[in-house]
């Protein structure tokens, strides 16, 4: 299934259009679901001027591979693409892309949401925000852990 899986972690920007084109090439699938996360210009009541993402190389990709394998064991999926940027990012920049294909929309929607929920709670990424008050590390939210528990 690795030929039907794309995992990329890096500083480079990605093209949502290119990912959609790759995902949609499976003629047997009736559903393509994608999610793109962006840097907000605010968080926890403060203006955000930049966000720096760090990760543990090798371990991060391993965690993403395991999350995708878990999704594949729950839903019948064809292609899966997960991209996560690291390094300095700014409001409006795209951070994360999750795309999945399946025969039916319900499986594709659920699998994409599952992957995103688990990515937020199980993949080793660390965020540092720059605000007017200075820099601060962003802790994981309780809502992310609650969302992941439903699976």
UniProtKB/Swiss-Prot annotation:
GO terms for cellular component: cytosol. InterPro entries: MoaE_sf (IPR036563), Mopterin_biosynth_MoaE (IPR003448). Keywords: Molybdenum cofactor biosynthesis, Transferase. Substrate binds at residues 38-40, 104-105, 120, 127-129. Pathway: Cofactor biosynthesis; molybdopterin biosynthesis. Pfam families: MoaE. The keyword Isomerase does not apply. GO terms for biological process: Mo-molybdopterin cofactor biosynthetic process. It catalyses: 2 [molybdopterin-synthase sulfur-carrier protein]-C-terminal-Gly-aminoethanethioate + cyclic pyranopterin phosphate + H2O = molybdopterin + 2 [molybdopterin-synthase sulfur-carrier protein]-C-terminal Gly-Gly + 2 H(+). The keyword Transferase applies. It comes from the Bacteria. GO terms for molecular function: molybdopterin synthase activity. Converts molybdopterin precursor Z into molybdopterin. This requires the incorporation of two sulfur atoms into precursor Z to generate a dithiolene group. The sulfur is provided by MoaD. Heterotetramer of 2 MoaD subunits and 2 MoaE subunits. Also stable as homodimer. The enzyme changes between these two forms during catalysis. NCBIfam families: PRK10678.1 (NF007959). Belongs to the MoaE family. This is Molybdopterin synthase catalytic subunit. It comes from Yersinia pestis. The lineage of its organism: Bacteria, Pseudomonadati, Pseudomonadota, Gammaproteobacteria, Enterobacterales.
């Amino acid at each position: 299934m690795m030929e039907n899986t794309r995992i990329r972690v890096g500083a480079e920007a990605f093209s949502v259009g290119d990912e959609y084109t790759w995902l949609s090439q499976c003629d047997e699938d009736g559903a393509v679901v994608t999610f793109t996360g962006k840097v907000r210009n605010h968080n926890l009541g403060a203006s955000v001027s930049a966000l720096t993402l760090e990760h543990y190389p090798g371990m991060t990709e391993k965690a993403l591979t395991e999350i995708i394998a878990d999704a594949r064991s729950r839903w019948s999926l064809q292609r899966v693409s997960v991209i996560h940027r690291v390094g300095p990012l700014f409001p409006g920049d795209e951070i994360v892309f999750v795309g999945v294909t399946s025969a039916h929309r319900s499986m594709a929607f659920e699998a994409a949401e599952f992957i995103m929920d688990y990515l937020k709670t199980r993949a080793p990424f660390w965020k540092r925000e720059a605000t007017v008050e200075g820099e601060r590390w962003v802790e994981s939210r309780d809502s992310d852990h609650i969302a992941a528990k439903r699976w």
